Amino acid sequence: MTQYKPSPRPNYHEPTPLPYASTARHLWGDAEAGQVADWIYVSSAQIHQIVWGLAPGGSFRHSAEFRTIFGADLIYYVLSGTMVIANPEHGEVQRVLPGEAAFFRRDTWHHAFNYGTDPLRVLEFFAPPPSQGTSGAYARTKPLLAHSRYTDDRALGRWPMERAAIEQTQTITVVRDQDLLWRFEDGQLLVGLLCSTEHLTAGKLLLPPGHRSGRLCHPGDKSLYLTQGTLHVFCPDKPDAPNWFELHEQDGFFLPAGSCHEFHNLTGQPVECLFGVAPTYC
């Protein structure tokens, strides 16, 4: 039997670039739960950011040692592949495509499947993070789910006539581009929110060629993942050099609470960057 061991928890105390090539690698799971490859960018006292992956046809479920129920808010943003995610306690199933996200809250059992021919890669924001006892330690306090269901027969005979009532009972929300809550920060930076709770605000920022943001500061920790383009990050209050950083696709960046920063796009290509802030955005 493979015993559960906590994943690595890289943490930083100043603005820090997180190159993809330098991320901590971890293999989660066992024969019963399935195995998941993790690329761990940061796991601070406030936020946890990883990319996890499944091969085509791969999946994760749960076992006695590896239980998939947490005491946190989570975003699973699909970078590549097709994710089918289920709540096996109720039978709820959602299909999530690249550029879409699944959002769920604490005490949600979940299983995930790569339902396509491409590798599945998913960006995860998790808060409160494992350092606060919200992952494996929390899961072991919950009764083990003995039976898994992947159909919700409560909706039969009622769909789509009672769609609103059925969706009201669902525990996993799929967030697509048309569902983003848009903000125009200081009239300069376009930000679309995937979620905003008392624990986690996550979203994507868009920066056209030649544009820059204003000065941004958050009371919570902030982590980034670059999905498109080349992004420069300026940290004017960082006391020691360097304070000017260049990010490429798949790179991350960490900003401790209160770290003021600016985003610059010096190229002729658009920038898209995903972010999480925890616990407080502003």
How would you describe each model-predicted region?
Residues K5-P8, H111-Q170, E262-C282:
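Double-stranded beta-helix
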Residues E89-R106, D237-A257:
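Short acidic-glycine-tyrosine-enriched beta hairpin
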Residues A31-D38, I50-F70, T201-H218, A257:
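Conserved short histidine dyad/triad with adjacent acidic residue
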Residues G53-A55, T68-I85, F125-P128, K204-P208, ...:
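Short, conserved beta-strand element in jelly-roll/cupin
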Residues Q46, P88-H90, T117-D118, E198-H199, ...:
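Short strand-connecting beta-turns/loops that link adjacent beta-strands
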Residues H62-A64, I85-A86, Q94, F104, ...:
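Short beta-strand His + acidic residue motifs that chelate non-heme Fe in jelly-roll/DSBH
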Residues M1-I50, A137-T201:
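A short, N-terminal "cap"/entry segment at the start of jelly-roll beta-barrel domains
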